[in-house]
Amino acid sequence: MAAPNLASTPAPEFRGRIYDSILDTVGATPLVRIKRLQAEYGVKADILAKLEFFNPLSSVKDRIGLAMIEALEADGTIGPDTVLVEPTSGNTGIALAFVAAAKGYKLILTMPESMSIERRKMLKLLGADIRLTPAANGMKGAIAAAEEILAEIPGSVMPQQFKNAANPAVHRRTTAEEIWLDTDGGADILISGVGTGGTLTGVGEVLKLSLIHISEPTILR
């Protein structure tokens, strides 16, 4: 059987690139029409899903993990020997672990012992040092433990996802711009889950500046 002539097969636009780092593959996630949902409910508008699981570690948090660490690098807060410390129970920890591994930083994560074995294994595979706290203490216990570690290790730094301005900023700079460009400025409604609020804040601010008809709903049903 003759080998296929791959050279004659049209390649998707995203092929033919070789990246210098896995970090360069964060973002630029696709928008996809959810046609079956539109048909099922008789919706005339396009329903689009932004596939953030196309990020390297399958989460929108990859954006903020990279953004927070690079912001700390840019302002000189961290250097090659800096130890990063963060309390986390979610995908931000995985994102920070992935970025820290790619850049060579030591990362200590504190989290309640109730977190799944799968999550712990993933973090360990990425090289993170995991410190478990009593489940009964919840995230407050993890935060307290992280603060104790910061006090013990000179020069250690906490990215602080809930307070870090790089969180919403990266969504203004990337996520919002991607949505705007991919829809030719035609986005009318944005629906987003809320954790730290970074995605909704960053994207919402940009769309509200660009589209005067966009506003927060006054009634939630």
Give residue spans per PLM region.
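PLP-dependent amino-acid enzyme catalytic core
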Residues: 1-216, 221
